[in-house]
Amino acid sequence: VYYYKKVPNANAKGSLLALLASGILVAAVLYGMVPGIVKVGGWFELFFVNTLGMSFNSGVMVYIIVLAASIIWGVYESYTEKNKMRMSVSFVLTIALLGIPFYGHGTSAVIIGIIVIAFLFFYLSPKMQASMKEKYRVSARTLNTSLLCTMMIVIGYSSYAIIVIRSTANTPMDQNSPEDIFTLGEYLGREQYGTRPLFYGQAYSSKVALEVKDGYCIPVEANSTTKYIRKEKTSPDEKDSYVEVPGRVEYQYAQNMLFPRMYSSAHIPQYKGWVDIKGYDVPYDECGNAIMVNIPTQWENIKFFFRYQLNFMYWRYFMWNFAGRQNDIQGSGEIEHGNWITGIPFIDNWLVGDQSLLPQELKDNKGHNVFYCLPLLLGLIGLFWQAYCGQKGVQQFWVVFFLFFMTGIAIVLYLNQTPSQPRERDYAYAGSFYAFAIWVGMGVAGIIKLLRDYAKMQELPAAILVSALCLLVPIQMAGQTWDDHDRSGRYVARDFGQNYLMSLQESGNPIIFTNGDNDTFPLWYNQETEGFRTDARTCNLSYLQTDWYIDQMKRPAYDSPSLPITWDRVEYVEGTNEYIQIRPEIKKTIDALYAQADSSGNPEALQNIHNEFGEDPYELKNILKYWIRSDKEGLHVIPTDSIVIKIDKEAIRRSGMKIPEALGDSIPDHMNILLRDDNGNPKRALYKSELMMLEMLANANWERPMYMAITVGRENQLGMDKHFVQEGLASRFTPFETKKLGATIDSEKMYDNLMNKFKFGGIDKPGIYIDENVMRMCYTHRRVFAQLIEQLMKEGQKDKALAALDYAEKMIPAYNVPYDWQNGAVQMAEAYYQLGQTEKADKIMDALANKAIEYMTWYLSLDDSQFFVSTREFEYHIALLNEELKLMEKYKSKLSENYSGKLDELYGMYVSRVKGTR
């Protein structure tokens, strides 16, 4: 924009040079100034703290003062022009303090910085400037403008200081705890997300390059970094200091390619789902052992870029906004979810199948929006009108085009996304859609020009006519998208978050472990903003692996005391106790030592063994004290895969937890935790978050209730799932083997929670918008009702079961939350059958069976290529219908006769269709 304003008769060469200069300036800010300020500020901090012995953040304060003084000095000198040498020195000093020359890491960054600073000083020196031609000289105005620009950028970025200030205040929510210049740098650099190759790098099957060193085969490091963390003090008198620890290590790969798009070894099946990968074999030297490695070809790599990253993850979103959207269900490439449509039948039928035969739940989806490509056509007209509107129009076109490109396709290139993203990413490209919307607006002017040129209309009548007609386009868009953007009357996030907290015991300052965003942030919101259940503590297991989060858990928050963690910070600081090996094979040796000491009759020998390993080496508190937290390196393991926890029976009785009826009043003396993964295989190590859970189990003594959100996966449950008792949206830790005792649900508490305490965010209101994420939580709530009802039926509490069924139907109605196999609808129908409520049961089963038939009918209407990729979904629905039919027949429902014939008919059509496509 600046170039075109200054040079009215700009040419292509000048435009490209201006674009290049713009890119250099952006790179200088993003990769020079932003990390450079952190880098130079870090050097000041290290010097003042480690060398001069001053307190934390003193060096940063000095740096800020020096940087501000340097900028002011430079602006003053370049404005007054009294002394050219001082002007050059002040400018170079400012650039150096901003860290722009120090690109890279470690020693190389310093060397590069010194070279750049020396060159810059030499170039700007008065003698050199005087000897140059006029066009190569740098004027004082240029230096002054540059310094003013950097000053404004620094002032803007100074807002990040609030992050450090807030973190230093130790607020209850303090992500990453960036309390100094080094942790702030990690925070700004998003280092927890890792890196990905962009222009050159590995493929998903590439192997790390190896070399033989000192007789060992080791991976070759491409580059490594170090970082500084605060040293933990061993005494209050010790001075503040930082210690250097290893940072991120990147390894060199033996097989690399240009523009690598398929690079993640964790997404190989997904890559192969998008591209038919044959690959080619390349030799790989495995320290003398030659093997062949199959990597994708460059063309296969490019095909994935176009098919997935560009088409599916950009143009699909683009068409959502300017052509139409199939529905708001997240798609992974399947034909029925998340695609773009137009509203024009013959186009849509060719793209995504016969839309008139769509299952009713897809037809009724509020995210089903059709624009008939009218915004797209207007945008294309505006694009061409601007591009062919004289020299000024061409210049404006390139400005809008680069805005469109840099906020759209350039982001696609930079993100290098893997398949199976956790959510739709259309928000990342909003700037690009805004840019195209400029062309949409210009399309009105383009149509006016067409009418004037070809219909010979006067300007005013043409403008009135076109404006009136084109106004219908945004009206159509608003009419289509209003219902799926209207959140009025919906309080799901607040209420469902409260339901998690309401599932917890009202006394005892309970703890609830969560893991994902949707079962954590609503709870934090309720505690932070609504002041709801501030006596409880929400603990996110994915953060519990970090030292900064453990710090927060050890502090009181709101009305909740600290969590029962007794470890000193030096024991869990980053790099310490990240994991502890499980070594059950040493159990025999330990048992032999105990037996030998016991049989020796020597009390001193037995006492020595107890002093070394504890009285019971496999009991949790002993393991924590004598093994995990031991100073002796050889004992820094877990010596068993079955941890024993002694049970304080009186504490259990005081705790308020339900004692299984099968036990009567008897409580076991101990419980065992089997250290297994979610597949039942023995674990080989426990990570820091799991160690913290064990620490809390050991110290809470059952008197402080501990819960696991039901949405946390088994892999994060520490093998405690056999001991859980569900009380709502959370399961309570107990010392009882509840699965064996048939006591996995406390029906009394759960009934009270669901029927009297839970709120449902307005999802019972007809017509309320429920998007996919909210629908998942609605499914969870219906499943919880189904679990409660099943337990009540087992206990013979039929009146309560019927009341819960009817209440679930009222609060989670099918007109907003359709019946589905995944949300407990089948279990509810069976309960209705068992209670003699055949009509209500038939209503649910009829909806489920009809839904399966609608999907299968639609799949059968697809063309061969579309049907081929949908066969798995067809088989899924036919299996569901078969199970539904069995349930109908079991309870002698009249529906079974009708659906039995339809099942046979559809299966026959499927068999003939499959044979025909082979």
What is the predicted role of each segment?
Residues 1-429, 436-509, 521-918:
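ER/secretory pathway lumenal C-terminal domains and tails of membrane proteins involved
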